Amino acid sequence: MKVNDRVTVKTDGGPRRPGVVLAVEEFSEGIMYLVSLEDYPLGIWFFNESGHQDGIFVEKAEQD
């Protein structure tokens, strides 16, 4: 995923939330995404852990 991609994020206790990627930072353990959400328009960081499906919080949104 890259900047300006439409995504959904997994948050505690609720459905996936739509957002837009503002920044991407790669690390050896995974990738961090700064995602703009309705409640956080300036963005909040989410970490996708490499190699662990339970550690994936940001996914590309399906195209309509």
Swiss-Prot record:
<dbReference type="Pfam" id="PF10781">
    <property type="entry name" value="DSRB"/>
</dbReference>
<dbReference type="InterPro" id="IPR019717">
    <property type="entry name" value="Dextransucrase_DSRB"/>
</dbReference>
<protein>
    <recommendedName>
        <fullName>Protein DsrB</fullName>
    </recommendedName>
</protein>
<comment type="similarity">
    <text>Belongs to the DsrB family.</text>
</comment>
